[in-house]
Amino acid sequence: MKIISVLGSTGSIGTQTLEVVRNNKDLKVSALAASSNITLLEEQIREFHPKLVCVYDREKALELKKRVSDLEVTVEAGMDGLIACATEESADIVVSAVVGMIGIKPVMEAILRGKDIAFANKETLVTAGHLIMPLVKKHNVNLLPVDSEHSAIFQCLQGNESSTVSRIILTASGGPFRGKSLAELKNVKVEDALKHPNWSMGRKITIDSATMVNKGLEVMEAHWLFHEPLNKIEVVIQPQSIIHSAVEFEDGGIIAQLGTPDMKLPIQYALYYPEKRRYLPGKRLDFFDIAKITFEKPDISNLPGLRLAYEAMNTGHSVPTVFNAANELAVAKFLNREISFLSITALIEKAMENVTVVKRPTLDEILNVEQETYDFIERECVKSNYHI
């Protein structure tokens, strides 16, 4: 029996994680955490019977407490509650599927207590990789990627020495606006950006895919996870999302991981690692149904999110935090129809140019830079024309 805690249980990765649990009797849930969706969280509590739950929104937590008063479950709130779920004593592995830098503290606390981490919160590594990776090594825990691309790379590396890697090939679908001109991108609406061609994901990550910021975040994540320099991480557009990523070795051989676009595959792989693979219901890849597999170079001119990510990581220190925080707020403003689609990356670039760089930031300094970046974006939106 493997016992898991799920942070972000009502989101896209969280609900798919619970689908995997539902299909496997040797997985048990000890803790669930959500932001504010207490209707779905209550359903999850009644089905999976966790000991502990957290609702980040304190008012919603009080309401949930009343709703589940007939059950033996402890309801916590806020950051303290999130950390309590991440460190729940009986949990063997913590699924970190919250959105944004809110996941940093809970993940660090879980590692300190020797928990393995199934990792879907890339922002945590992007901003605090220099703090988290030494902890992973010190406490000898597994940091298991749940992103389809990083899981693919992780699988390709099994049985191979990392010293023999010559290149990591990180694939991308190109998002809904692959091949679009700058003129076409000027008139993009929220509904257009939320139509990903291949994957079913949450709203924020779907927008990140459209701007190519998501792939930039994944480059940073790959740097930390696989200890490779940026010049050995190459992004390749693979529009059909069949090749999830690949690794080239120094003898010229390339190992790739292929499959249908189903997030439950990397989730289940992480939950059971290092055990043997388990049966997973779902559609199988039929090579005879594939009309073609094509490859393209990413468009860093019209969709500069990837270029900005490389620049942020090359500068290092607190700049990846600025990149991430600026993107988080800009995406939220776009989804609220306050700014245009192209303004997202314009604001990121402006923030990277103006927010003070902090060298080797501590956790507190990372959070301060995050707030400073939010404040800068708010001021910039007031004084400049980023609106639709």
Curated annotation (Swiss-Prot):
Instruction: Tell me the SUPFAM superfamilies matching this sequence.
Output: 1-deoxy-D-xylulose-5-phosphate reductoisomerase, C-terminal domain, Glyceraldehyde-3-phosphate dehydrogenase-like, C-terminal domain, NAD(P)-binding Rossmann-fold domains
Pathway it acts in? Isoprenoid biosynthesis; isopentenyl diphosphate biosynthesis via DXP pathway; isopentenyl diphosphate from 1-deoxy-D-xylulose 5-phosphate: step 1/6
Which family would the database say this protein is a member of? Belongs to the DXR family.
Q: Which organism is it from?
A: Lachnoclostridium phytofermentans (strain ATCC 700394 / DSM 18823 / ISDg) (Clostridium phytofermentans)
- HAMAP family named among the record's database cross-references: DXP_reductoisom
What are this entry's molecular-function GO terms?
1-deoxy-D-xylulose-5-phosphate reductoisomerase activity; manganese ion binding; NADPH binding
Q: Which residues bind 1-deoxy-D-xylulose 5-phosphate?
A: 122, 148-149, 173, 196, 209, 214-215, 218
Put simply, this protein is called 1-deoxy-D-xylulose 5-phosphate reductoisomerase
Stated role: Catalyzes the NADPH-dependent rearrangement and reduction of 1-deoxy-D-xylulose-5-phosphate (DXP) to 2-C-methyl-D-erythritol 4-phosphate (MEP).
Which key words are in the record?
Answer: Isoprene biosynthesis, Manganese, Metal-binding, NADP, Oxidoreductase
What EC number(s) are associated with this protein in UniProt?
Answer: 1.1.1.267
Binding of NADPH, residues: 10-13, 37, 121, 123, 202
Q: Which residues bind Mn(2+)?
A: 147, 149, 218
Sorted alphabetically, the Gene Ontology BP terms of this entry are: isopentenyl diphosphate biosynthetic process, methylerythritol 4-phosphate pathway involved in terpenoid biosynthetic process
The reaction(s) this protein catalyses:
2-C-methyl-D-erythritol 4-phosphate + NADP(+) = 1-deoxy-D-xylulose 5-phosphate + NADPH + H(+)
Q: Which cofactor does it need?
A: Mg(2+); Mn(2+)
